[in-house]
Amino acid sequence: MKSGFVSIIGRTNAGKSTLINSLLEEKIALVSHKQNATRRKIKAIVMHEKNQIIFIDTPGLHESGATLNQLLVQSAIKSIGDCDVILFVASVFDSTKDYENFLSLNPQVPHIIALNKVDLTDNATLLKKLSEYAKFSQHFKAIIPYSSKKKSYKKGLLDEIVKYLDEHEYFYDPEFLSASSEKELYRDFILESIYENLSDELPYSSEVLINRTKDTPNLLILEANIITDTNSHKGMLIGKEGATLKRIGKDARFKISKLAQKKVLLKLFVTVKKNWQKDEEFLKKLLNDEN
């Protein structure tokens, strides 16, 4: 029996959250084409044979001067030292530059490269990319081609990860899908629904805070505040006669209901907090895993 923690590291939009969902065969990590959709570290528990792997989905690594993005990157870098194995996720279409930047952080724990999205390319392109990574072979333990859309890739990746975990009793109940709080997951589902319903920069000026939860045997009641930075953005979130907010609520309610396995009553409110993305105290509270 082995058990351990694996930090998933990589550039924004490398497919980290989609990879976690494919390993779980459940939707639990926020997925969006928008940069840095993942704002908090999600811990997802995958049982593989008799072994327990706890994946930590971190914010994407990238360069930015914005306060929020700096804190996201700090969170990702910190997780490098708080795990047993690092899984570096890279798209087969990306250059090795991001991996070289990762190596410059001097990771002290073993790492594996998951070369993602291989279902979207041909063998010649895959082999070329593998040869590009080969010059770094003294640094990584293995490089594994992966596709989140095909279950056949799952076992090979998990087998490789388990090799580098220590013998240890389970850290969590094997029946759990995630060590992250349900409140945190519900919050991310609402945020994802904002991403899906509003384009361009508006979602980046928005955040979600859960104000109240009440869980009964047949009904989950949630009240949440969508925080945004201007009155004009508030108007866009609400939409004409509340249509946009209703659509966001409907989409989020469906996702939460699927996870909670019960009917959900979701009440959404929109609040303006100017310059919240530059308020370090507010952001640190927001990004705190225990919040």
Swiss-Prot record:
GO molecular function, one term: GTP binding
Keyword Nucleotide-binding (UniProt): yes
Chief location: cytoplasm
Binding positions (GTP): 10-17, 57-61, 116-119
Coiled-coil regions listed: none
Region (G4): 116-119
Region (G3), start-end ranges: 57-60
Bilayer disposition of the protein: Peripheral membrane protein
Name this protein carries in UniProt: GTPase Era
Organism expressing this protein natively: Campylobacter jejuni subsp. jejuni serotype O:23/36 (strain 81-176)
GN (gene name): era
